[in-house]
Amino acid sequence: MPPPTLTETIVGRACRALVLENDWLSTTILLDQGADIHTLVYKPKGVDVLWKPPRPPREPGVGPTPAGDSLAVWLTHYRGGWQTIFPNFGPAAEHQGAPLDFHGEAARTAWQVDAVEVAEARASVTLGVTLLKSPFRIERQMALDAHRPVLSIRETITNDGPEAMDCMWGHHPAFGAPLLSPDSFIDTGARLIETDDGYAAPGNDLPLGQAGRWPAIANRRGEPVDLSRPPAPGSGHSRVLFLKDFENSWYAITNPVLGFGAGLVWDGRLFPYACFWQETGGVREYPFFGAAYVTAIEPNSSYPGQGLPAVIHKTGTHLVVGPGESRTVELKAVLYSGVRRVIRIDPHGNVWHGN
């Protein structure tokens, strides 16, 4: 089997990027935009499983900086795909003397390449960034073996400051069609769910602050909703909820018509929650104008995604990282063939299907 490869490329007009691939999987990493995982392609089917917004983003450094707050900046440059969310998750906020951006600074900052290793059996790249608005630096190693459709990620945050720092930390992979469809199944090791208590979007059909057991919940009319089955495109839903109480920290989206799926498994000790964001045409104005069809399931240290000060006040699930302290999380994204529902993804990225 050919060895995995790592090559340089340009995305759009000028965004520096890397392509890490083997015979099974190809991924594009945007160095100039948060080290976003822009594509995750299952090569046997030729399908990129990650969602892209219906309207093209403005490229960083091209044209004037958009007016408005950090949410406006995020939406202007958002390319879909998969982001690191750090040190804030949700609305912009002031905390510990710093203005924290919407969804944090890490995803809007250029990262550098710190190390590259390419061998017959494995290719890896180590990326890094030093933040400006908090005393953190982040290191992320991404690796691909020659013979498996499994992308391994090892990410470390380090507090270089003299004081303990509060933060929220997560990953934001967003999945779209054709993987996502009404034929698809969403399976997970989570046992409990809780809807966001402040998400009052017009398309949100779920009651606010409602607890339940995965995957069943009642909508605002009292009708049953099976969250493991995606609604159809254009069905007008806009949902935010949180997955909790994981027996094992994993999820999978399987499309039996296409005969393959995508899954994620991670260290649940550091990321015990996952935000579930779903748009099926519910946001009919800016920024999606009714055209979004996306489900993102986002492992996170904390919940809800309402900004760091709100999380400290509401749930106390934020991280506190001491001076000089580091924290490390490991995640694996796996692409797999199959038509049956997934009952488990183990920490090595092996996928187990039901009967």
Give the location of each predicted region.
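Surface-exposed acidic/polar loop and edge beta-strand patches at domain peripheries
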Residues: 1-152, 163-166, 170-355
